């Protein structure tokens, strides 16, 4: 039944909409989580510093270092650092120490993975990773005082010289080149610098004298500037260039401390430059182009290198005493001795903080944070040096049991990690590691600390250059991406742990700073499994959701070495990941064990299990958004819902579902995997030059390498979700125990006097609601993960091809859409874009004559949700279609086209029908257009719902029927559009293609597909014949309608189809344009020799009330109906047809009178508005005779028409007839009053003759006596010719005997009128004229009646003569007497 299928279709549509809605909801969860991850505080916020003039202090509270004392937090034993390896010094170097005479130094060059050692005038370098690849330089004769590694300025040296080694002696400064044999020319990539291939060029590139300056340290900027610190307290720079100029040397030394100053030094700033205070450290902030120096006495100076890094200006200097004083004022209770001396300064780059720029570390481990410009002004240049925060090391809180750091001699600060080496004794150091990676979102800053013993005295401590993921910043997300880098916990899935190297006389110590995921791995391995108290504590410390996200990094790992750990992590994920809960915020009390700092009411609604030994995790975890952020909660407070019933039961309102840590952890992990690209633009425009012109290309915003990384992570997550389907089925263990259910319904209070069993049932049902809601959400997330993986896999595939070419093949609208589309949009909603991109990719293969089978299979494997089996079929069909264009053989081309048609027909309900049909038109495969369109219509509506909808009057409530009906019409439109195109082409002017578009020489037409008129006509006929074969009734109807609209009714009537007559009958009954369809219907009947039916349709047309049909047309319809009826009676002798013919003839007679009335009104009264209405009424319908007389002829005084009406009706009233004739004559005379007598006589004669010929045969309506008498009176009055009336009657055809009879009676009636007008002889004159006519032309009377008529005339003349004799004699009487006598003689001769 259609209704059943309709329900199925509605269900299918509803399912698709539900899936889309689920994806949208999952996408919103990810949006929120991503926003949460991006809301991490700046360093200044962690330090609670609001402005440079509002300094703060920290480190004195127990919670600043929550691990520093017992009882603060029950946390697992988490290692902060992990030793990778210890590598002893190469034996060759140990021997060299025996030859030392003056000086030795040691350090690290992380960019080239080398450690270095100077012994007197020699320098040695080796790979600190393994102690190998030892190299040395002994080309100097003086003791080396300072060493520096420089990345050279661009464009000065050959590509293989990637670094410069700068050596300073008491005499000169030598710059050597470091060459790498395995550098790819022009690539800028150093291939495996740690595995050899490095060579120290023996000849110095530059050498210049020191001018007796003792240099202590060398540093360089990223753009190649070299700075040196002098023992004299001056800052020097070595400026170098490729060639010497007119006014500059190739290499020269500049003293920035003694050179002329380009600025006015503020009076408050006291600079001291003396040999007593050497500069011992130079630090460069390459992110802001600022240089800092630290002197031996603790003076810190600030230099501004300018926006471009090429300038130089000293802007601030602060002495150690000033710093100690400022620190003492901030931390008033602390002994000021811990604030000096400063042993290290470190740059805080813009990627870590916008407001804090410099950190100084004292010998007691105190950190001093400085700012050089106002807060919240990232582009401001440095203008001061202000202490904004004092951070005390562990051990300063009241309850701390940790020993305070002391004798710190080396310090390293890197991305929030502070490493300090303190001298325990002469032989050993203690390595401190302090960081806030565990609490990156917590304000104020909370840190963990760890100490470990290091053998030997630390000579150097350095961070090894770490991998950094570039932020994808595009026009769509640039306002949402923080300037600073995300915390480690957010990036730990894609960045390795930070690596450090410590050098001592014993060798190199390599170690990692562990990320939370590394710490979790350590716990899993040490506990040998996924459970244990330590692991549970880890989940509590980091919160369930954050710990689950971290756990997933291990659980989703596909590395072979992680297989066992992955299984343990999976177990921990499900064991400690929590469960969905129902929360009642209004009743949850603050846990009693939460201290004053953590027990803020803002956390009182977080679900904390009763009796938990832990402080509220929302104030400690990573991040501090709450254990289950409200954004991931689902309100369940709809009226009448089960949640509301439970609320009523306990006197509460507003319960909400709080998803489990497992659910939220999956969201967090997915958001972090996708975070770098989720809301980024898909593409960016790049401008490059080619042949001196700029070309704009559209490129992917994400490089392939990043896509590969994201895909690997997504694949692991997808496999995890597929592998562990139980994640949506409830927790491990028995979920139905009462105790556990109560825990999951946080804040649900037991009624004091309530029904315990009923409450337990409510609790159980609540829990099941929460579980079901979470299950639905997780299924949506799983689908989102799957779609994301496939969308990105497709994007990577596009990038691996010629991306700009593929995008260039897209339509302009898709190209523009791409620019405003994010990866999120691509995944969730932009199926059209993905389809267009895939089509473009395949088209590139086809264009290059490459088979699409391979790429099609690859797409099916890579992204089956985006490229299905049907898509593969479509690609194959498209390939056949495109290749057919290149085939010369007509037979082969047709074979390929038919094969493509078969492929398209398999998927016709999904194919882009208009596009394919357009291509078929281009190759003139019109059969394909018809067949494919009809197949598509059938597949889109297999049950014929569209026809059912049409035949039942297109009811509004049948939504499914309307949809299928419209889909069918859209399919048929491809056929009718093609037919229209052929019709237009067949009618096009033959010469039009040759009309030039502009003046100039002739241009040959470049369109090879242009059809001639004849070809177009031929293809039209062929296509129409093919279309007529269809058994699809709805298509036939669509075809008929198109033929009508295209004014091809003749073609329509040639169609022999069982559907045509019913369609025309239906449309003639229901369509607004009924006249057109009825006109076609009678023509159809007539063509098929159904004359009786044609006559009846024509009769209905004539009778139809419509302003579209004129009265003239109605007469034509009646006339055609009469002809058809006569044809019908000629074929068959059915009585009804004869009667109908008679009715038609009568109808025709009345209709003619109606036309006469209308024409008379138009002719005589067209200027009257009321007459116009009457004329329109006469057009609108056929009227009966009574209505014509009463509403038109009589009111408008249309005497002729009234005469016609009574004549037609057979109504005889002599008085009325006389009146009408009199009116007719008088009107004619009145209308011609302005004319001459002869013209008036002519006009009246014409009118009388016209009417006389109509009515003379019916004396009742042509009263000759009255007419002649009235006319003669008018003639006499107007003094017209005496023979006018006789002549007129003669033209009418009135016989002379009858006319003589009328005149004779008129004469004998002795009417006094003639005497009144003084023309008593007028009638005798008329009779004389009449008889004279006879005498002169006897043939006017029939031969058989001539003798009798002659005798009658003689008798009459005798009588007239007698009458004349009785009259008094006058000239007139004598004249007429003579005339009659003469006439008498002539008559006698005729006798």
UniProtKB/Swiss-Prot annotation:
It is a peripheral membrane protein. One of its GO terms (cellular component) is nuclear membrane. Signal peptide: none annotated. Keywords: Disulfide bond, Glycoprotein, Membrane, mRNA transport, Nuclear pore complex, Nucleus, Phosphoprotein, Protein transport, Translocation, Transport. InterPro entries: Nucleoporin_Nup133/Nup155_C, Nucleoporin_Nup133/Nup155_N, Nucleoporin_Nup155, Nucleoporin_Nup155_C_1, Nucleoporin_Nup155_C_2, Nucleoporin_Nup155_C_3. The modification Phosphoserine is found at residue 1057. Glycans are attached at residue 526. One of its GO terms (molecular function) is structural constituent of nuclear pore. Its main location: nucleus. Residues 604-630, 985-1012 are annotated as: Disordered. Transmembrane segments: none annotated. Disruption phenotype: Homozygous null mice die before embryonic day 8.5. Phosphorylated. Phosphorylation and dephosphorylation may be important for the function of NUP155 and may play a role in the reversible disassembly of the nuclear pore complex during mitosis. It comes from the Eukaryota. GO terms for biological process: atrial cardiac muscle cell action potential; miRNA processing; mRNA export from nucleus; nuclear envelope organization; nucleocytoplasmic transport; protein import into nucleus; protein localization to nucleus. Interacts with GLE1 and NUP35/NUP53. Able to form a heterotrimer with GLE1 and NUP42 in vitro. Forms a complex with NUP35, NUP93, NUP205 and lamin B. PANTHER family: NUCLEAR PORE COMPLEX PROTEIN NUP155 (PTHR10350:SF6). Belongs to the non-repetitive/WGA-negative nucleoporin family. Essential component of nuclear pore complex. Could be essessential for embryogenesis. Nucleoporins may be involved both in binding and translocating proteins during nucleocytoplasmic transport. This is Nuclear pore complex protein Nup155. The lineage of its organism: Eukaryota, Metazoa, Chordata, Craniata, Vertebrata. The gene is Nup155.
